[in-house]
Amino acid sequence: MSRELPSSFDGKSEFDEDEMDILEKMAFKCKQQPLVPLGVIATTGAIFLATKSIRKGDRVNTQKYFRYRVGFQLATLIALVAGGYMFQVESDEQKATREEILRAKAKVRERLWIEELERKDEAMKSRKKRLEDSRAELIQAAKEGFEEEKKWTDAIENAKEEESAEGNDNKDVSN
């Protein structure tokens, strides 16, 4: 059978954060709180512009970009806290949903596992039956062969006895 056995590692659920790799997890978190990545990008841009103005020697713009950086970091922090507060209620609902999904997934895996065991059991029973049938056929063929061989050996022995009896009769007649 080339069919694969069910496994506890089959498939990935959207809510299964433990089974996600780092990029999938980042994308999932960005979808949950979309303002945080925007704040991070804005902060990074402000730092980049501040670095550029430092190289030019422009102190006024450097101070302005560093102030923007602080403002963007504050906005990111506020978005993070507000998003955490807003998603806390949703998180509890997600936990309940995740538990239900995991229970359903476990039931499906158990059902698939039981079906696979039943298939294997049926295959084993059919192999056993074929083996018993072929063994019975082999025994029957052997019996028939032995009976046929016995007939031939009996016929040969009878022919030898008849020859020896005829030979003895000829010796008696000649004496």
Swiss-Prot record:
Pfam families: HIG_1_N (PF04588). Its main location: mitochondrion. Cytochrome c oxidase subunit which plays a role in assembly of respiratory supercomplexes. Residues 90-144 form a coiled coil. Residues 147-175 are annotated as: Disordered. Keywords: Coiled coil, Membrane, Mitochondrion, Transmembrane, Transmembrane helix. This is Respiratory supercomplex factor 1, mitochondrial. Belongs to the RCF1 family. One of its GO terms (cellular component) is respiratory chain complex. InterPro entries: Hypoxia_induced_domain, RCF1. It comes from Debaryomyces hansenii (strain ATCC 36239 / CBS 767 / BCRC 21394 / JCM 1990 / NBRC 0083 / IGC 2968) (Yeast). Residues 7-98 form the HIG1 domain. Associates with the respiratory chain complex III/complex IV supercomplex. It is a multi-pass membrane protein. It is found in: Mitochondrion membrane. The chain crosses the membrane at residues 34-54, 70-90. PROSITE patterns: HIG1. GO terms for biological process: mitochondrial cytochrome c oxidase assembly; mitochondrial respirasome assembly; regulation of proton transport.
